[in-house]
Amino acid sequence: MASCFCNKVDVTEGTHGTSSSDDALVSSQDPRHPANLICTLCKMFYYNNWVTGTGGGISIKHSKTGHIYIAPSGVQKEQLKPADMFVMDPASGSYLRTPQLYKPSACTPLFMSCYKQRDAGAVIHTHSQHAVMCSLIFDKELRIANIEQIKAIPSGKKDAKTGKDINLSFFDTLVIPIIDNTAHEEDLTEGLQEALQKYPNTTAVIVRRHGIYVWGPSVDKAKVYNEAIDYLMEVAWKMHQLGIPPDCGIGEEKKYL
C-alpha cells in the first residue's frame, strides 16, 4: 500500500491577511508567471466546461524557485485573480502565502503526490464530462488504441541516445487507470498514489463519477496532455455508444457496426 503524503501538507484554512512580501510572490507582469497563468488557464478550462461551479483545480510549480502555486477552493474559476493564489514550500509542506478570504484546495494532497511521485511541473484537475462518462463505462482502466491523437501522450520511455521523452505511437494503446471516488477529495490521495505506483507510465488518473487528474513535466505539457486525453475520452465514449471497443484493431470496427 502506498504511503500517504497528505499528512505532510498543511491544508488548514487561512485566517490572516497577506503582507507586501507575501504579495510579491504573486505579483508579476510576466503572463507566464504561475499566479497569472493559473488564472488564464482556469478561464480557458471554464469555457471548455471542465471547471464549472467552482469545481476542479490547477497547480503549477515555479520553474526557478520551486514554489508550488495552487488555485483556492470554492472559487469560480473564471473569476480568479493572481492575489487569490496559495503558495507552498514543497520541502516543508507549509504555506508561504495564504489569501485571507479563501480555503486551500482540497486537491492539494493529490497535487503534492504528483509532484513527489512524478516530479511534475504542473497538475490539472477537471470535472470533465468525458472523464465521468468513461468512468461509468469502463471498470479499472480506459484503453484506447489506433487513434491519431494518442501520439500527443508520453509513453513513459526515453530515447536511449538523446534522453528525450518518447511519445506513444499511433499503433500503441493508451491505458489510463480509473479509481473510485470518495466522499472527500483529500481521501482520494491513497488511491491516486497506488495508481501512480501500479501504472508508472501513466500521465493521468480518472476518478469515477468525478473527473480526472493530469500532470506533466511543465504546465505546457500538462495542458497538451489534458486536451489530448479529453479528446480521446470523448472518442472512447462515442465508440462505446456504437458498440466498438476503443482498443480494437484497425479494421475490426467493421464487425461491430
Swiss-Prot record:
Catalytic activity: 5-(methylsulfanyl)-D-ribulose 1-phosphate = 5-methylsulfanyl-2,3-dioxopentyl phosphate + H2O
UniProt: substrate binding residues: C107
Keyword annotations from UniProtKB, A to Z: Amino-acid biosynthesis, Cytoplasm, Lyase, Metal-binding, Methionine biosynthesis, Zinc
Active site residues of this protein: E148
A Pfam entry, by short name: Aldolase_II
Enzyme Commission numbers on file: 4.2.1.109
UniProt-listed GO biological process terms: L-methionine salvage from methylthioadenosine
Alphabetized GO MF terms: methylthioribulose 1-phosphate dehydratase activity; zinc ion binding
GO cellular component, one term: cytoplasm
Binding site for Zn(2+): H125, H127, H210
Family as reported in the entry's similarity comment: Belongs to the aldolase class II family. MtnB subfamily.
Protein name per Swiss-Prot or TrEMBL: Methylthioribulose-1-phosphate dehydratase
Originating species: Lachancea thermotolerans (strain ATCC 56472 / CBS 6340 / NRRL Y-8284) (Yeast)
Gene behind this protein: MDE1
